[in-house]
Amino acid sequence: MSPIKQAVILAAGNGSRLASVSGSLPKPLVDFNGKPILEHVMLAAEEAGIEEFTVVVGYRGDVIKSHFARDPRFNITWVENPDYHKANGVSLLKARHHVHGPFLLLMSDHIFQPQTAAALLQQPIQNDEVILAVDEKLDAIFDMDDATKVCRMGDYIIEIGKQIRCYDAVDTGMFLCSPVIFGWLQTSKTDDNCSLSDGMRQMARRRKLRAFDIADGMWQDIDSPATLAYAEGLFGFPLPTFFAEKVIASV
């Protein structure tokens, strides 16, 4: 199999839970150790071997595109999602005509280590499946209530969702996808809306969703002042003073 060089990044949401520290910025541009969160995601993916990015934007997408236009180091194809108020599966569907084979799917607000993405990219993938990177270090999950949980049977995920009762790992927001995912999302739509988990749930029922354990790898989703502060500490970065003051006030 040829090396996978394309990543799709979902960056369309409005990030309302980070509003107290983001000011007027869209969430992907919120500062994390001197750089926007999205830039950290892209740098880590680039170090893992990604060369081509397809970034789906929606809320204040013009501001995000303008920021990266000033630094053309990344090869980016921008995709607009005017329906950014809908679930994230809709955002991924907007990218379907820009994908030309297996790809790495990332969230614009999930920080991770490059070696974790590199290890996922090395996994052999069939043309009818998706591989989800999962974390079984449950005691280390910062906000379990908000985490998307998975239940595995061997190498396969058999159930996925935030509310499932039986689980043994959590979804890290990092997927190795074959283009088949688009068909599953399309058939999962209800009222012209679907989440990634909706599509993954359909695949899990047919044993088409495999799990990849990140072992000692670190990651963190950043969707609130508290998780921003936690991620800064987890990755060894001091939280900027003015952010720290706002985080303390919001907790």
Where are these regions (language model features)?
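Conserved beta-loop-beta/alpha segment of the NTase-like Rossmann-fold superfamily
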Residues: 65, 71-148
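Conserved core of the sugar-phosphate nucleotidyltransferase
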Residues: 113-190
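Conserved beta-strand segments of alpha/beta enzyme cores
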Residues: 28, 75-77, 156, 208-210
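Residues at the starts of beta-strands that form the adenosine-phosphate
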Residues: 6, 51-53, 75, 102, ...
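Phosphate- and divalent-cation-binding pockets in alpha/beta enzyme and binding domains
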Residues: 17, 40, 63-66, 88, ...
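N-terminal glycine-rich phosphate-binding loop and ensuing alpha1 helix
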Residues: 2-62, 76
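Conserved alpha/beta core of the MobA/IspD/sugar-nucleotide pyrophosphorylase nucleotidyltransferase superfamily
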Residues: 2-7, 168-251
